[in-house]
């Protein structure tokens, strides 16, 4: 039986807005409306959150991994010499909240790019609820994981009750008012303050002044991670060593040395699992086959099997020492062109259909993500913020030590569900 919780509503249609480290901005179709009066103080409301029967979140972890690899591969091909970091979990949450308002061909295109499992809307919301609960259940001794989702809406626009119910059920997201149409830069400041708080100050600015012109809704997801290694690296064992960058230059990087860690090879890739305290989370460092093309990515299904084998210590997994560079990565990037290239372009045009969100919603005008990832001797600190803006109308392992001395990938994953919290490509560990 589906159980209803967290009911807060106003009349038949709620006027709302929300927050998360991943934000989506949406615009409405038609001519621009007159400048509305200043909105009342911010009010946050929730729809009817349906407590769904417990389902397996792992298919959604697999979906987000496939989506994240697609995005990272496309991004790398457009910028093969730079360090790249993204949060598939955060980006999928921001876009997933938009998907819940999409209909027709727009929904089909978004589902294909997001690799969403084929299901009914009710089953989808149940799966998203299980995924969200798993993410929020990763906290433990030595590990802090904070995930939050929010919808921000201009108070002059009407958000459909059914949409509020869907985001409350799938993402535990509320809707908060912000003066997106009357004072967009003030709304930017409000959203940035919320993102900074949700990421413990790691992302002080997701959006910039002028970035929310003609945006009526912003869907945000925020994700923060601070995790200690199960076995920390000894600082005294960190030493300089050569690293050949994606540009073909040799630089001196600071290599952490430790082990043994579980390692295996599959399809020419060498994978090493570095668990965090408590065993719920792990980093998987992936060294591509020697001589592989610059932006070669592993297959999502194969990567899932590798991470599962490392977590379980399956036959073929051996102990190896590791030399892994320290890194400190930061990015803030628009994802629109990458998502368009992957097949989501209709969602950004006036042919889009977001009538499940509001009769006044037109299309996605903004997809922005900011990420930080710091890997050091004691553990990993990482954060992500995504904003989606919706516009209104108008097997041989080789040496016993595995040295990551050329461009490689890093994946921070939930060992139980396979949910990819962070995914990175290190082209030059000395660059920040």
Task: Give the positions of each predicted feature.
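Structural recognition of the beta-strand scaffold that forms the well-ordered cores
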Residues: 85, 93, 150, 282-285, ...
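Short Gly/aromatic-enriched secondary-structure transition segments
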Residues: 110-114, 233-241, 294-305
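Non-catalytic, conformational "gating/processing" segments within enzyme and secreted inhibitor domains
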Residues: 122-123, 127-284, 289, 315-394
């Amino acid at each position: 039986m589906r159980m209803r919780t967290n009911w807060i509503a106003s009349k038949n249609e709620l006027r709302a807005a929300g927050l998360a480290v991943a934000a989506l901005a949406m615009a409405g179709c038609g001519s621009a409306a007159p400048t509305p009066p200043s909105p009342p103080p911010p009010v946050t409301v929730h729809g009817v959150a349906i407590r769904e029967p417990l389902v397996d979140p792992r298919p959604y972890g697999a979906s987000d991994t496939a989506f994240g690899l697609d995005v990272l591969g496309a991004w790398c091909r457009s910028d093969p010499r730079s360090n790249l970091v993204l949060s598939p979990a955060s980006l999928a949450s921001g876009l997933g909240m938009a998907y819940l308002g999409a209909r027709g061909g727009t929904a089909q295109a978004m589902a294909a790019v997001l690799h969403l499992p084929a299901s009914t809307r009710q089953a989808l919301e149940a799966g998203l609820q299980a995924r969200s609960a798993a993410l929020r259940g990763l906290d433990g001794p030595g590990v802090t994981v904070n995930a939050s989702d929010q919808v921000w809406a201009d108070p002059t626009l009407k958000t459909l009750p059914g949409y509020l119910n869907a985001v409350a059920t799938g993402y535990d997201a509320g809707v908060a008012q912000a003066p997106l149409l009357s004072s967009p830069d003030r709304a930017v400041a409000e959203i940035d303050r919320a993102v900074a708080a949700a990421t413990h100050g790691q992302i002080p600015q997701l959006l910039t002044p002028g970035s929310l012109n003609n945006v009526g809704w912003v869907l945000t997801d925020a994700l923060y991670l601070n995790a200690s290694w199960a076995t920390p690296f000894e600082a005294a064992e960190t030493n300089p060593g050569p690293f050949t960058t994606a540009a073909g230059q040799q630089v001196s990087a600071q290599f952490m040395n430790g082990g043994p860690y579980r390692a295996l090879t599959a399809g020419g890739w060498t994978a090493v699992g570095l668990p965090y305290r408590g065993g719920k989370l792990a980093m998987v460092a992936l060294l591509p086959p020697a001589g592989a093309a610059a932006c070669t990515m592993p297959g999502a299904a194969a990567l899932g099997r590798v991470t599962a084998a490392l977590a379980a210590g399956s036959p073929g997994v051996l102990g190896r020492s590791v030399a892994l560079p320290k890194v400190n990565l930061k990015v803030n990037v628009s994802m629109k062109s990458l998502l368009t290239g992957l097949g989501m372009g209709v969602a950004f045009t006036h042919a889009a259909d977001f009538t499940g969100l509001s009769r006044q919603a037109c299309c996605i005008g903004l997809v922005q993500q900011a990420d930080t990832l710091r890997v050091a001797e004691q553990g990993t600190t990482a954060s992500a913020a995504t904003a989606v803006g919706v516009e209104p109308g108008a097997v041989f392992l080789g040496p016993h030590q595995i040295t990551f001395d050329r461009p490689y990938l890093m994946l921070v994953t939930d060992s139980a569900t396979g949910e990819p919290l962070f995914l990175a490509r290190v082209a030059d560990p000395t660059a920040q």
